[in-house]
């Protein structure tokens, strides 16, 4: 006997593969099992029983025919037969060994090959059919994709997020009490599929209290943190799998090839079986030259299994015909429909997730096969193709991670004294942010695709909003809220055209800070959105690569008080529009590639502060024109290449702060002492070798920075500046400090590190405001002071 279990390995497949088997593949699988049983049964009979039985033919005939053998077939019994007729048999004088020899010889020579090998052919053909059907499940290039797809499909089908997403959409689409009840029933039914008895108990509880389900959010739709992370990982797997599978169509072509091969195999089997099935006969005439051994050369043989084999052959042909029809239908299905494209149109309409994309190639083909099994699989799988669904999940995970208590721990006071919440590099904006009604400043950095929800209106104290590389969409209903509450707006992006348009409609805005580049072809024009709606704007800061001052700046000329232009080294050419800013008090032109002080600045009669940091200024002869800016009190010319200060600096009598650090100055003009209103003078990081004695005329001077120069001595007149509080002399070449330093009674900070001092004058003890913390000097020099001086400085 041939055990059928030996053939089990040919049909064994993972149970999960059944989702990729349409009805015709399932039918074909059962047909192959039936055909295999026919073949195995025939082989068993062939092996275990006699194949053929032969008897010698006593009639001597030169040409052997089947006529004598046909006489042995059953015929009608004669009507009249003698009552006492003696039956005599023929003696053949053959022993058992001779009969066996003749049987085997006639089986090999006289019996047709089809009758001999029919059961073996059935088994071989059936095994080939089985291999063709399951080849794409075994071939490495296709099996890996199939296994990966089925693994992801099962996780998507069982994921709690799928249930939640579909139930939420169902709840949004349905209206009215009846619809609410149906949505609740759907949620309960979905929850009932979960593992364990807890789900059944919850289902019974909800069914028992239908009103409670309608009024309260069902617990079964909530995800814990672990389930949320699993769903998030599943979204990433689906994305990567889609990118990988949509690149080719190996699954589609492999399925077509194996189907075409099965059709060709079916036609070949059908043709030769119909031709040779009649060769299976009950009687077979056999002529072999064995007269010298047995005494006979002609035999009549009986093929013992011919009758059964003929019936099995017709049965097998019937099964093959049905199998072939399924293969032909499969080919029709493959070529009649666009299986390399799959549309989720019906799913989009049913679920309301309009962003579910259509797929192609192998991904589409597998989804078509899934629909033949159960279309619910593709519907639930589509949830993980939707970006809307993914954003909802991210939002849910964010809300789990960023609780209100955790957010309150991040609250800090910013430089403006506002209570600020800063969030950086998050996948989204947590809804819990809007539960912190005490927030006054919201800073969002590197957060992609922000859409402010209606909960933003709960931040009733919000005054400042910063969007740093965080593109944001604002519903129209919230624009009124921000227009009434927001005072400061900061936006930083790659290009200025990415600045949201709703920013320019915030009428209550007082400060607007924009940072981003103009496209290379638009940098010279420097076109910015109109600022006419910003009626309250007082401060405008723009960091870009503009070739000129944007024309829209003049829209706020009547009330703009501070303008800051940071050009990152790009040359700012056209500055004439600055003349229209009559109310401007502070102007910053930083890194604008300026080589001269712009003449347009001298027309700003209300100007109080001017900052020209990090430009290419070499000469400041135009400084005389600042006498027209009668309110100018602060002038910052630091980080330039200025080699000298002109003598007519004396005209700036109202100047209170002058910054000339990080230049190339070697001397200062004596006329600088005529700037009697000067309170702060910073000439650090230059090449000064000496100070003019006229510096002692600066009686209002409180801060003097001379660090990082080449000073060898200080004029005695310097110590006439009795109001001096800060004196920075670090990193010079001073060899001694005058005892007159004791006259600076208001001095509270003195820096002497990096000089050639050998000792400190004990008159430092007369500087009542100078403490140890304010004296920056080497420890050895400090220890050289008298003990009473040190004790006085260390007193709190």
UniProtKB/Swiss-Prot annotation:
The residue ranges for the Cytoplasmic side of the membrane come to: 1-22, 138-265, 335-796
Gene Ontology cellular component?
cytoplasm; endoplasmic reticulum membrane; lysosomal membrane; monoatomic ion channel complex; plasma membrane
**Reactions listed under catalytic activity:** chloride(in) = chloride(out); iodide(out) = iodide(in); taurine(out) = taurine(in); 2',3'-cGAMP(out) = 2',3'-cGAMP(in)
> What GO MF terms are annotated?
volume-sensitive anion channel activity
Residues the record marks as carrying a glycan: 63, 302
* Entries under SUPFAM superfamilies matching the protein: L domain-like
Name the GO terms of the biological process aspect.
aspartate transmembrane transport; cell volume homeostasis; cellular response to osmotic stress; cyclic-GMP-AMP transmembrane import across plasma membrane; intracellular signal transduction; monoatomic anion transmembrane transport
Q: Which Gene3D superfamilies match?
A: Ribonuclease Inhibitor
Cell membrane in keyword set = yes
Sequence ranges of the LRR repeats: 508-529, 536-557, 559-579, 583-604, 606-627, 631-652, 654-675, 677-698, 700-721, 723-744, 746-767
Show the disulfide pairing.
54-301
Q: Which SMART domains match?
A: LRR_TYP (SM00369)
- Its transmembrane ranges are 23-43, 117-137, 266-286, 314-334
Annotated compartments: Cell membrane; Endoplasmic reticulum membrane; Lysosome membrane
Topology with regard to the membrane? Multi-pass membrane protein
Q: Which residues lie on this side of the membrane: Extracellular?
A: 44-116, 287-313
Keywords from the UniProt entry: Cell membrane, Disulfide bond, Endoplasmic reticulum, Glycoprotein, Ion channel, Ion transport, Leucine-rich repeat, Lysosome, Membrane, Repeat, Transmembrane, Transmembrane helix, Transport
Q: Which InterPro entries match?
A: Leu-rich_rpt, Leu-rich_rpt_typical-subtyp, LRR_dom_sf, LRR_domain-containing, LRRC8_Pannexin-like
Domain comment, in the record's words? Answer: The volume-regulated anion channel (VRAC) channel forms a trimer of dimers, with symmetry mismatch between the pore-forming domain and the cytosolic LRR repeats, a topology similar to gap junction proteins.
Q: How does it assemble?
A: Heterohexamer; oligomerizes with other LRRC8 proteins (LRRC8A, LRRC8C, LRRC8D and/or LRRC8B) to form a heterohexamer. In vivo, the subunit composition may depend primarily on expression levels, and heterooligomeric channels containing various proportions of the different LRRC8 proteins may coexist.
Family assignment?
Belongs to the LRRC8 family.
The record's function comment reads: Non-essential component of the volume-regulated anion channel (VRAC, also named VSOAC channel), an anion channel required to maintain a constant cell volume in response to extracellular or intracellular osmotic changes. The VRAC channel conducts iodide better than chloride and can also conduct organic osmolytes like taurine. Mediates efflux of amino acids, such as aspartate, in response to osmotic stress. The VRAC channel also mediates transport of immunoreactive cyclic dinucleotide GMP-AMP (2'-3'-cGAMP), an immune messenger produced in response to DNA virus in the cytosol.
Report the protein name in the record: Volume-regulated anion channel subunit LRRC8E
